Protein backbone atom coordinates (compact mmCIF):
# COMPACT_ATOMS: atom_id res chain seq x y z
CA UNK A 1 0.00 0.00 0.00
CA UNK A 2 2.81 2.43 0.84
CA UNK A 3 4.52 1.62 -2.46
CA UNK A 4 1.34 2.59 -4.30
CA UNK A 5 1.18 5.85 -2.31
CA UNK A 6 4.83 6.47 -3.14
CA UNK A 7 4.21 5.94 -6.87
CA UNK A 8 1.19 8.28 -6.80
CA UNK A 9 3.29 10.98 -5.11
CA UNK A 10 6.19 10.49 -7.52
CA UNK A 11 3.98 10.80 -10.61
CA UNK A 12 2.96 14.33 -9.57
CA UNK A 13 6.32 15.43 -8.19
CA UNK A 14 8.27 14.45 -11.32
CA UNK A 15 6.22 16.91 -13.37
CA UNK A 16 8.02 19.75 -11.53
CA UNK A 17 11.52 18.42 -12.27
CA UNK A 18 13.61 20.48 -14.71
CA UNK A 19 12.94 19.18 -18.22
CA UNK A 20 16.40 17.66 -18.70
CA UNK A 21 16.14 15.78 -15.39
CA UNK A 22 12.50 14.78 -15.77
CA UNK A 23 13.39 12.42 -18.60
CA UNK A 24 16.50 11.01 -16.95
CA UNK A 25 16.16 10.93 -13.17
CA UNK A 26 12.38 11.31 -13.09
CA UNK A 27 11.77 8.47 -15.52
CA UNK A 28 14.20 6.25 -13.60
CA UNK A 29 12.40 6.96 -10.32
CA UNK A 30 9.02 6.25 -11.89
CA UNK A 31 10.08 3.06 -13.69
CA UNK A 32 11.89 1.72 -10.61
CA UNK A 33 8.79 2.38 -8.48
CA UNK A 34 6.63 0.53 -11.02
CA UNK A 35 9.13 -2.34 -11.13
CA UNK A 36 9.03 -2.47 -7.34
CA UNK A 37 5.24 -2.81 -7.37
CA UNK A 38 5.63 -5.69 -9.81
CA UNK A 39 8.19 -7.38 -7.55
CA UNK A 40 5.87 -7.00 -4.55
CA UNK A 41 3.08 -8.72 -6.52
CA UNK A 42 5.47 -11.48 -7.58
CA UNK A 43 6.60 -12.09 -3.99
CA UNK A 44 3.02 -12.03 -2.72
CA UNK A 45 1.81 -14.57 -5.28
CA UNK A 46 4.94 -16.74 -5.41
CA UNK A 47 5.16 -20.24 -3.97
CA UNK A 48 8.91 -20.97 -4.00
CA UNK A 49 10.46 -19.49 -0.85
CA UNK A 50 13.94 -19.24 -2.36
CA UNK A 51 12.57 -17.32 -5.34
CA UNK A 52 10.51 -15.04 -3.10
CA UNK A 53 13.58 -14.26 -0.98
CA UNK A 54 15.61 -13.51 -4.12
CA UNK A 55 12.82 -11.19 -5.27
CA UNK A 56 12.90 -9.44 -1.89
CA UNK A 57 16.64 -8.83 -2.33
CA UNK A 58 15.86 -7.30 -5.73
CA UNK A 59 13.12 -5.17 -4.14
CA UNK A 60 15.48 -3.92 -1.45
CA UNK A 61 18.03 -3.02 -4.13
CA UNK A 62 15.34 -1.04 -5.97
CA UNK A 63 14.37 0.71 -2.74
CA UNK A 64 17.98 1.71 -2.12
CA UNK A 65 18.19 3.14 -5.64
CA UNK A 66 14.90 5.02 -5.18
CA UNK A 67 16.03 6.43 -1.85
CA UNK A 68 19.29 7.67 -3.37
CA UNK A 69 17.57 9.24 -6.38
CA UNK A 70 15.00 10.96 -4.15
CA UNK A 71 17.78 12.32 -1.93
CA UNK A 72 19.64 13.63 -5.00
CA UNK A 73 16.46 15.25 -6.32
CA UNK A 74 15.95 16.85 -2.91
CA UNK A 75 19.53 18.13 -2.73
CA UNK A 76 19.15 19.75 -6.16
CA UNK A 77 15.75 21.14 -5.13
CA UNK A 78 13.96 19.44 -8.02
CA UNK A 79 11.27 18.43 -5.52
CA UNK A 80 9.33 21.59 -4.78
CA UNK A 81 8.44 21.92 -1.12
CA UNK A 82 10.13 20.40 1.91
CA UNK A 83 6.87 18.68 2.88
CA UNK A 84 6.80 16.70 -0.36
CA UNK A 85 10.41 15.57 0.07
CA UNK A 86 9.82 14.68 3.72
CA UNK A 87 6.69 12.71 2.79
CA UNK A 88 8.57 10.73 0.12
CA UNK A 89 11.41 9.96 2.53
CA UNK A 90 8.94 8.85 5.22
CA UNK A 91 7.18 6.57 2.74
CA UNK A 92 10.55 5.13 1.65
CA UNK A 93 11.46 4.49 5.29
CA UNK A 94 8.14 2.74 5.90
CA UNK A 95 8.47 0.64 2.73
CA UNK A 96 12.02 -0.29 3.70
CA UNK A 97 10.94 -1.43 7.16
CA UNK A 98 8.07 -3.46 5.74
CA UNK A 99 10.28 -5.15 3.16
CA UNK A 100 12.92 -6.00 5.77
CA UNK A 101 10.29 -7.57 8.03
CA UNK A 102 8.72 -9.44 5.10
CA UNK A 103 12.09 -10.77 3.97
CA UNK A 104 12.87 -11.84 7.54
CA UNK A 105 9.61 -13.76 7.79
CA UNK A 106 10.32 -15.49 4.47
CA UNK A 107 13.80 -16.49 5.66
CA UNK A 108 12.30 -17.89 8.88
CA UNK A 109 9.71 -19.83 6.88
CA UNK A 110 12.49 -21.26 4.71
CA UNK A 111 14.47 -22.31 7.80
CA UNK A 112 11.38 -24.02 9.26
CA UNK A 113 10.71 -25.76 5.97
CA UNK A 114 14.30 -27.00 5.71
CA UNK A 115 14.24 -28.12 9.35
CA UNK A 116 11.03 -30.09 8.80
CA UNK A 117 12.51 -31.74 5.70
CA UNK A 118 15.68 -32.76 7.53
CA UNK A 119 13.65 -34.37 10.34
CA UNK A 120 11.76 -36.62 7.92
Language-model regions: role of each:
Residues 1-120:
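Amphipathic alpha-helical assembly/interaction segments
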Amino acid sequence: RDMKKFLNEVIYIIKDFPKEQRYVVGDRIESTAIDSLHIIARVYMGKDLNMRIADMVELQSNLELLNTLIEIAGEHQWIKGRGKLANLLLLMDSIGRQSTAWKGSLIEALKRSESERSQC
